[in-house]
């Protein structure tokens, strides 16, 4: 830190105080259009997840809706059930009660693969530990959730050329930086 000065709060504006804190003028108000959320895309009703090790519920009777166009954040102190709730929604953890509806379809008892087919995705909080296989190439990591789809296999065998074609497309589309392309 660097000393920027001393001011009397009652004689100082928010703009002046923020300028002293940041070192430049800061726009304190953002002009934006009012949000117009769409239809309900995720409906969570009374979700409960029991933790057998702790012999109590880690998530109890959680209910909320997410509308098209909304971004929802789950916040709280570590250990208060956010991870378990996400695991329950994505199928990684079994619910002991409640219902999950995605785009009007009850997915409560669906497998992870079926939830993925239905359009649900999950970005884990630790991407390196749970989001990819570090020993796999970039192209193999890019098809982890879809290797079973017909376009990537034939007769039960992975079609490497199709996997590479798909991963090269994603690398170009999202400007992915890698040492040697998709085989990295």
Where does each model-flagged region fall?
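Glycine-rich phosphate-binding loops of nucleotide-dependent enzymes
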Residues: 1-184
């Amino acid at each position: 830190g660097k000393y920027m000065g001393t001011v009397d709060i009652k004689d100082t504006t928010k703009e002046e105080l923020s300028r002293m804190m940041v070192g430049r003028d800061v726009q304190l108000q953002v002009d934006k259009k009012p949000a117009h959320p769409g239809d309900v895309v995720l409906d969570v009703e009374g979700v409960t997840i029991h933790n057998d090790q702790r012999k109590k519920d880690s998530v109890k009777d959680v209910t909320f809706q997410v509308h098209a166009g909304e971004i929802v954040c789950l916040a709280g102190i570590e250990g208060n059930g956010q991870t378990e709730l996400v695991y329950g929604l994505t199928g990684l953890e079994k619910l002991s009660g409640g219902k999950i509806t995605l785009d009007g379809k009850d997915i409560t008892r669906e497998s992870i693969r079926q939830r993925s087919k239905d359009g649900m995705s999950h970005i884990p909080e630790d991407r390196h530990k749970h989001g990819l296989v570090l020993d796999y190439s970039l192209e193999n990591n890019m098809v982890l959730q879809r290797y079973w789809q017909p376009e990537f296999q034939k007769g039960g065998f992975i079609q490497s050329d199709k996997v590479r074609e798909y991963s090269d497309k994603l690398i170009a589309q999202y400007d992915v930086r890698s040492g040697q392309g998709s085989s990295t």
